[in-house]
């Protein structure tokens, strides 16, 4: 199955800005990989909460629509809230 997530590049980085994003129902994330610069991104929580329940989400290649260009990535790590059904941060690697 193919998954697509719309995202924007983050300009503010740090604990305070990440908390503000989470309170606004956004998920901070990063895309990294060998030979490429890491890119801090943000996307809506509703875009990922439902698709991450599928088993093939973690093993398939995702498409992130990043400010008009498509980037192929795979999920490396996902941080979740301790007891709420919230995703706090996602690490993606270039596919």
Curated annotation (Swiss-Prot):
The keyword Ribonucleoprotein applies. GO terms for cellular component: cytosolic large ribosomal subunit. GO terms for molecular function: 5S rRNA binding; structural constituent of ribosome. Pfam families: Ribosomal_L25p. PANTHER family: RIBOSOMAL PROTEIN L25/GLN-TRNA SYNTHETASE, ANTI-CODON-BINDING DOMAIN-CONTAINING PROTEIN, RIBOSOMAL PROTEIN L25_GLN-TRNA SYNTHETASE, ANTI-CODON-BINDING DOMAIN-CONTAINING PROTEIN. Belongs to the bacterial ribosomal protein bL25 family. This is one of the proteins that binds to the 5S RNA in the ribosome where it forms part of the central protuberance. This is Large ribosomal subunit protein bL25. It comes from Shewanella woodyi (strain ATCC 51908 / MS32). The gene is rplY.
């Amino acid at each position: 199955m193919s998954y697509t997530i719309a995202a924007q590049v983050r300009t503010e980085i740090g604990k305070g800005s990440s908390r503000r994003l989470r309170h606004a129902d956004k998920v901070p994330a990063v895309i990294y990989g060998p030979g490429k610069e890491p890119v801090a991104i943000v996307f809506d929580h509703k875009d990922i909460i439902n698709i991450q329940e599928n088993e093939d989400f973690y093993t398939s290649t995702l498409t992130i629509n990043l400010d008009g260009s498509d980037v192929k990535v795979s999920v490396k790590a996902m941080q979740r809230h301790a007891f709420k059904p919230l995703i706090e941060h996602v690490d993606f690697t270039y596919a």
